């Protein structure tokens, strides 16, 4: 089951402030989404990088945690951010379709259109991060 997340663009040194924020999207450019979790981001990273899921999960693991109960902060790997930022619309649709067919999204009842929307929003934000030389963080 996924949770509410905030995906934001920020400088690496902002990580501590992001984890302490009650709602990062009010302080940094980004978007809020329901139903996401570390496994979904790891699966996306695995699809983009060609890594095995377990390796991708390790790379997407929490960067910071306010406590054992959360919130947690992940930094989406730079190579996935770069890949997302460079993909054209038809390629983003293909990634969304592949991601929608994974166990992580199917079990939570995500439609292909919902997954494509998530991937597109993430790619748009990845473009901002790359243009500004910043990182893409996931607060959950």
Regions picked out by a protein language model, each given a short descriptive name:
Residues 133-135:
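Short secondary-structure junction motifs
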Residues 1-124, 128-131:
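Acidic (Asp/Glu-rich) sequence patches and key acidic residues
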Residues 137-140:
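Short hydrophobic/aromatic patches at helix-to-coil boundaries
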């Amino acid at each position: 089951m996924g949770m509410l997340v905030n995906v934001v663009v920020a400088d690496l040194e902002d990580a501590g402030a992001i984890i302490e924020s009650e709602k990062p999207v009010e302080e940094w450019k980004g978007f809020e989404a329901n139903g996401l979790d570390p496994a979904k981001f790891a699966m996306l990273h695995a699809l983009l990088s060609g890594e095995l899921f377990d390796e991708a999960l390790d790379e997407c693991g929490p960067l910071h945690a306010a406590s054992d109960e959360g919130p947690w902060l992940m930094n989406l790997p730079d190579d996935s951010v770069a890949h997302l930022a460079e993909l054209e619309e038809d390629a983003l649709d293909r990634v969304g379709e592949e991601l929608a067919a994974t166990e992580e999204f199917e079990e939570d009842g995500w439609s292909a259109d919902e997954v494509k929307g998530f991937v597109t929003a993430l790619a748009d934000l990845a473009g901002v991060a790359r243009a500004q030389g910043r990182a893409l963080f996931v607060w959950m």
